[in-house]
């Protein structure tokens, strides 16, 4: 009878350990999948991770929090914590700032337009983007505050603000370096191909 009890205890212990291993494997699998998505699309937002992973909101939140606490990923919270973007822990902070702006559709359009034309007026940007003047002004302010563009004033008869990219080399390097992650953005791909041909 003692042998049966001992064998039962051993087998229960084995199943407990096996269950723990299975749970750890599942945890590692989910973490690996999330890290892969973040590596493939630096600057990805929570909703996109939710869609790609197929996880429920609570489960994704749990895993993202663990990855962030263990410093396997970086969470960049901007705009009073309204916008969070996720990055691999090996991406320099200067690049995360640029990527965050490029991932925003309106700001990406504005940045690429200014890159192509060296400097532009607000009206030229409005005409190109076909967005409301207030929308363009708001995004230009964000780009200026984020250190992406600077404002110059031409000294002609009619003084105008000109918007110019502040660090041409850094922005074009990021566009080129992360070209694959911007694959769905046709306009970025066209621009990087032009830059590579020069």
Regions found by a protein language model. Give the residues of each.
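Alpha-helix C-caps/helix-loop-beta hinges
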Residues: 41, 70-71, 146-147
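Residues within the helices of the helix-turn-helix
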Residues: 36, 47, 122-123, 141
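A short acidic, leucine-rich amphipathic alpha-helix
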Residues: 48-52, 124-129
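Canonical helix-turn-helix DNA-binding module
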Residues: 57-62, 131-141
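Short capping segments at the starts of secondary-structure elements
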Residues: 41-45, 117-121
